[in-house]
Structures are given as structure tokens and as C-alpha cells.
């Protein structure tokens, strides 16, 4: 079935996996029902790329920031540079930033850079896109401290943690993981989260849904997650669910697109 109003809350179309056919793919997405994509930077170099893509494709927007795996060469004036980039009309958020304790980037450095970007998001009154991998305790300690307008992307916590996130004013995005066999926690969260706080994402090119797991992901495949979550929530119309999550994206990112 052909769906419309597909809004991908979180992707990485600057990734090298798209180098062979990026323009061809991105030109085709609106024909597949995609109405919006927020492309997330991981450092200052990728920030320039995601802004350039947002300039080229009307349906695309950008988030700029430092990812916790990309902190080897952070310049002293990085906050000033990020702040300058946010003045671009297609930049809608700070991100992707957060904490990732799966890898070996020093935790004190991760926490400092994340906290500084949290403060910046408040100073600029902008949403912030949060990465939280195996770091729930420290991530939520900082979210409690600053209470930003945050999207916890690819949410991997429990229902209890989701409820705390909602109380803090956060939004949550889910994607292809909900189609995996071992996705019990994600399914429970999808079933319980207030519908007005739920966004859909791909994290493209990663996290492709079943039956494409392990292959390159793109925004048109978000429908597999949408179908699964609609089923879990007993929403009879997948299109209605896509309409709701697209409106949620517009609300979170302060967009006038629908």
C-alpha cells in the first residue's frame, strides 16, 4: 500500500553508505510518501554536509552537534560554531549528542560535551536530539537537571524510564528495532507511550527493519515500524498513525509542514 506523510525524525544521509546513489535516492523519497526527514550531524564536518543536503531537498532539515563517538578533535570554540550554524533556516535542532558507554570514549569528556550542548539548546531555545546507549543513569541525570526540549532517539530503555522521560517533557522515537524478534522492551514502550510523544525514525542507513535487517535503511522503510506499532496499539489505520507521528515531528521540531 502506498502511504503518505512519512516523517523520519532521525537519519544520517551524509553517511558513506549513501555515496554511490545519494542524490537518486533522496530525489525518490517524496514519491514514496516521505514528507520530512531530520538529518543529524555527528561533528562539525558532517554539520556542513547535512545543512547542504537540507538546502538541496525541500523536505529535509538538519540538526547540528557532536555525537559522543566523535569527540577526538573537538575545537575549543565548537559551541560558538554550532550556535552560528543554528542560524540557518533549515537547522531545527542541536544534535546528535548524548552519551554512549558501549565504546571507549572517556566518560568525563562525553558528559562535559553533552552537558555543554544541553545548556546551548536552552540558551538558543532549540530542541535537542539525545543519543543514550548503555548510559541511562547519567543521561537521565542530566535530563533531570536541565529539562530541555529533548528527543531521546532510538529509545532503548524500559517502560518505567519512558514514563520518566515523558514526565520530563521528552519525546521518544522508535524505528526498525520494533520489528526484531528480541524487541520486547521496545514493543512494551511502543504500546504504553502517550501517542502525542511518539515519533518514528530510521537512523538510516542503520537499523533497517525486518525483512531488510542488516541491509541499508532509508526513510521509505519506516512504514514497517509504523505497521508494527499500529498493530501493537490496535490502531486500525496505519495511515492515521503516520499522520499522527508526522504531526508530532512538526510539533517537536517547530515546523510548519503539514
Language model region names:
Residues 1-258:
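Mid-domain alpha/beta scaffold segments of enzyme catalytic cores
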